[in-house]
Structures are given as C-alpha cells and as structure tokens.
Amino acid sequence: MDNRVSGTTSNGETKPVCPVMEKVEEDGTLEREQWTNKMEFVLSVAGEIIGLGNVWRFPYLCYKNGGGAFFIPYLIFLFTCGIPVFFLETALGQYTNQGGITAWRKICPIFEGIGYASQMIVSLLNVYYIVVLAWALFYLFSSFTTDLPWGSCSHEWNTENCVEFQKTNNSLNVTSENATSPVIEFWERRVLKISDGIQHLGSLRWELVLCLLLAWIICYFCIWKGVKSTGKVVYFTATFPYLMLVVLLIRGVTLPGAAQGIQFYLYPNITRLWDPQVWMDAGTQIFFSFAICLGCLTALGSYNKYHNNCYRDCVALCILNSSTSFVAGFAIFSILGFMSQEQGVPISEVAESGPGLAFIAYPRAVVMLPFSPLWACCFFFMVVLLGLDSQFVCVESLVTALVDMYPRVFRKKNRREILILIVSVVSFFIGLIMLTEGGMYVFQLFDYYAASGMCLLFVAIFESLCVAWVYGASRFYDNIEDMIGYKPWPLIKYCWLFFTPAVCLATFLFSLIKYTPLTYNKKYTYPWWGDALGWLLALSSMVCIPAWSIYKLRTLKGPLRERLRQLVCPAEDLPQKSQPELTSPATPMTSLLRLTELESNC
C-alpha cells in the first residue's frame, strides 16, 4: 500500500500535508476519542435505547394493563424517573469524561460500587442478550425459501398433534387438548430442540452456535475501532429499523381485523390503575427501554465535547424512545387483530410478549400473508438490527469502563482491539450454555434475575442519592450549567432529590413483596437450586455497592470522620465552576439543598 501523502499547492509551492494520526499523551497513551459530530452520539444512544423491548414488551404491557390507561403510570414514571436518571447518567459521563466506573470514582469515591454494579449487570447482559440475535439470524436464514418452514406440519420435526390452524375451518372442532401448531413445533423442536428441564442441558445446537458466532463477529467489527467505527455503523443500524417498522405498520393497518387489534391495544380500562402491578410494570419498562443503570449512557456521554447540549439531546431521545414504543404497538397489534379474526379466537389467545411474540406470534401471522417469506425477512432483519446496536453499545460500555480504569494498559495502539476480542470470546463461550437443548431454561434465568427490574431499581436508588444528596444536586446543576450554558428545568433537580429515589424504592420493595419463582411457559417449575442460582445472579450486581463502600472505609487510614471526608469529596481535577456567594436570605429549601453536599467543604 502506498503510504505517501500528497501535498497541496499554494503560490506555486508544494507543501506536504501531514497524515491524520492518533494523538499521543506524554505518558505514551493514546488521547481519549470524541464523537466526530453530534449525530453520531444521538444515533448511538438511539440505537442502544430503541431495541427489542420497544417492539415485543411495551405493546403487550399496554394491552395487559388497561390499554390507554397504562399511559398514565408510564408517563408519570417517564417524567419522574426516566428522563431525570437518563439525563443524570449522560451528563455525568460528559462532565467527568470517564466511563461507567471511573465517573463515579471521580465525583464520589465511596459510591464507586455503583459503577461496578452497573458493569456487572451489563456483563451478564452481554452474555445472554446476543442469544436473541442468534435465534433471529436462524429465522432470517430460514425465511429465504418459497414456503416458510413453520407454515406446515409436513416436516420431520413435526408430530402427529401438529394442526395447521390457519388452514382449518373454524366451524369444525379439530383441535384437541394436545394439539399444537407448526410455529410452536418449529420453535421448540427445530430451533431449540428443548429438553424437559434445566437439569438436562443435552447437546449443543450447532446451527445456533454458528449464528451466535456470526452475531459476535458482526458485533466485534462494529466497535473494534472505538467511536470511529461505532459512529459510522449506527447511521445504518439505528435508522434502518424505522424503515422496516414503517413498512410493517403500513402492511398491518391495511389487513382485515387490524382495527379490532388496535382497539384492544388502546381501549382504556381505568380500573386497572388500582392494581399495583400495573405501576410496577410501567416503572420496570422505563428502566428496561431507556438502558438506565447499565453504564451505557455514561460511556456514550463521555465521548461528547464538554459544551455539548446533552440536556436537549436527552429530552429529545427520551421522547423519541417512548414515541417509537407507541407506534410499534400499532404495527404489532394490527397484525394480532388480523390473526384473531382469521383464526376466530379472542385476541388474548394470540397476544404474546418477549420471545413468544418474535418467534411464535409474529411468524404465525406472517404465514397468513401473501408473499410471506418477504414479510418474514423484513421482520427478522428488523429484529436483528434492533438487537445488534443495543448489543454492541453494551459491549462498548464495558470496554470503555475497563479502558478508563487502566488507561496505561489499554489506551495504546491495538490494545483496545485485543480487549474487545477477549470480551467477545469469553462472552461467546459462556453463552454457549444457552444454545444447548436445555439452554432456554438458562436464558430465562438470566433474563428474569440477572438484568431484572429489581437490580436496575436498586442501582437507580443509589445513583440519585449519590448525585443529589452526597455530591450535591445544586453543585451538579452548576456543573451542567457550565457545560451547556444554562440550568435545566428545576423539576429534574427535585426529581433527583425526592421523587426518583422515593418512586424507585417503593417499586423495588413492591417487586420484592410480589416476587414469584420463575416458571417456563407457566408449566415448568424450576428446581430450588435453579432459583438459588438466579438470586446469585441478581445479588452479584446489587452487593457491589455496599461491599465497595465497606471495603474503602476499612482500607483507608485515619479517623472515621476523616475517611468519610476523603470518600465523599470529588476529584480535584474535575472542571469546577466558580461559586458566587449567596446574597439573598437563606430559605428552608436553599438550606436543605446546601445540606445535600454534607457540608464536606470539598
């Protein structure tokens, strides 16, 4: 390859142009990268937060929890928890210029455990979330055929109980207690070859292993050059799913029965608001869909320029995320309404959530459409892209945290690429257990416990307490004003102080009280050691916060008061805005806000 650089001509003279090279610090480490432009940041965050949950979880929760009435608790959680915590994490990354662990070390060392907790959650998420991509790739490849393999009962994996419901005359009672559909048999007997329990893992499903390997290879090359590659990839992965969603929406609303499905999706049932479970579902959906408490927003925000208007970006992204969930509901329930009418069954019998929607309900609907392979390809390609950018941003979050913890080790030429490769290979091999014949039971354990709403709520409580009551809400607002040039809406500050921790704590306690052991398909009950393993996965993140605080208090020398003072003071190298003296008389509220900084004189 010719590495010579052409020159420029000025007044007849040729001047050499230096090649663009990575900047190197005095200690030999590479300078920390930044986004090339704002659009790369916006699309990266959009790709992370707009994922599978918008398509397969939010619409079902609306239907299940009172239709349009569900928007009341959802919007309350959005404005008291979703936007405030989303903004807090993004602004924290931009202000400290650090990843998900060292950002917390910078502003409050005693709560560095928040960073470890979020990275533990994201590490577990990296292992199991990508398995969904492996399933989606398998379905995508299976869709390149004239007759979809889940459309009939004539394959070797089908049983004598298989009934093609979509071709059955509804007036005839051909179903039996053991009847099943070709879609379910394709999912359970062809894709998963599912065993009878977690105690029987069986052999690896090698076709899925190859799909998982392909997913990890794609993920690796999306982020291997840091934000330089990530920022370019998201132009496609974050925008193309919208095109697919619009196509599926137009097709869905033009089908017979679509209006019935949309009515079930939106018809308000106000009485459901008296059920605490509805409020818990709204809260956990906000945390799931906004990627809160995973360290991802902090990592992405850390690559912003210091004076980027992150407040405006965050509000716009939150509204975009919720709007996408709302629109996706029309696309999904118009199809479910069509299925309900075609099969002559109530919509409750075809409505699914989670993997059941993506790999059972929607494939069943696609079979009934003209040119079904085309619509199957569109849908599963959308699923792959929705999951892909969420996946590689989560990996980026973990890698950013590790690089910022050990910059002299990893912030050198090719070291980062090697680190990403190690993370990918280790996660790939751990994830293989979920591609065995009993792997679905392991996947459900990870999904139910490892990255559950309970874990995210626990971390969110300490995030708001740390920033608002230890570091100081007013101090952080001053830092934000220094970055963006003005102070955000005051309600966000009071959410950090009061509403967010209170709402998160109440929802967390309710989730503990209402806890029910995990089951699969409402039939299979996990053995006691399965639930014990699940709780270990959940506690592996939550224990990080108190454990780190105790560890730091015990290892520091000196009187307890002095140790506490050291552990609550922010790093001296953080940008600080000069504080003008207060000339107005103190009010109870201003006195309270000054107390939030613990009078540490930091």
Curated annotation (Swiss-Prot):
Q: Which residue windows are transmembrane per the record? A: 41-61, 68-88, 121-141, 207-227, 233-253, 282-302, 319-339, 366-386, 418-438, 453-473, 490-510, 528-548
What keywords would UniProt list here? Answer: Cell membrane, Disulfide bond, Glycoprotein, Membrane, Neurotransmitter transport, Phosphoprotein, Symport, Transmembrane, Transmembrane helix, Transport
Extracellular side of membrane: 142-206
Its primary localisation, in coarse terms, equals: membrane
Q: How, per the record, is this protein's activity regulated? A: Taurine transport is inhibited by hypotaurine, beta-alanine and nipecotic acid.
Phosphoserine modification sites?
591
Q: Where in the cell is it found?
A: Cell membrane; Basolateral cell membrane
Q: Its membrane topology, per UniProt?
A: Multi-pass membrane protein
Annotated GO biological processes are: amino acid import across plasma membrane; amino acid transport; creatine transmembrane transport; gamma-aminobutyric acid import; monocarboxylic acid transport; neurotransmitter transport; nitrogen compound transport; sodium ion transmembrane transport
Record PTM Phosphothreonine, positions in chain: 587
Tissue expression notes: Brain, retina, and peripheral tissues. Expressed in hepatocytes (at protein level).
Q: Output a single Gene Ontology CC term carried by this record.
A: basolateral plasma membrane
Sites carrying sugar chains: 169, 173, 178, 269
The residues exposed to the Cytoplasmic compartment are: 1-40, 549-602
Q: Which reaction does it catalyse?
A: 4-aminobutanoate(out) + chloride(out) + 2 Na(+)(out) = 4-aminobutanoate(in) + chloride(in) + 2 Na(+)(in); taurine(out) + chloride(out) + 2 Na(+)(out) = taurine(in) + chloride(in) + 2 Na(+)(in); beta-alanine(out) + chloride(out) + 2 Na(+)(out) = beta-alanine(in) + chloride(in) + 2 Na(+)(in); hypotaurine(out) + chloride(out) + 2 Na(+)(out) = hypotaurine(in) + chloride(in) + 2 Na(+)(in)
Cysteine disulfide partners in this protein: 153-162
Q: Supply the InterPro entries for this chain.
A: Na/ntran_symport, Na/ntran_symport_GABA_GAT2, SNS_sf
In Gene Ontology terms, what is one molecular function of this protein? Answer: amino acid:sodium symporter activity
What exactly does this protein do?
Mediates sodium- and chloride-dependent transport of gamma-aminobutyric acid (GABA). Mediates transport of taurine and is the major taurine transporter in hepatocytes. Can also mediate transport of beta-alanine and hypotaurine.
| Family statement | Belongs to the sodium:neurotransmitter symporter (SNF) (TC 2.A.22) family. SLC6A13 subfamily.
Q: What is this protein called?
A: Sodium- and chloride-dependent GABA transporter 2
Q: Gene name?
A: Slc6a13
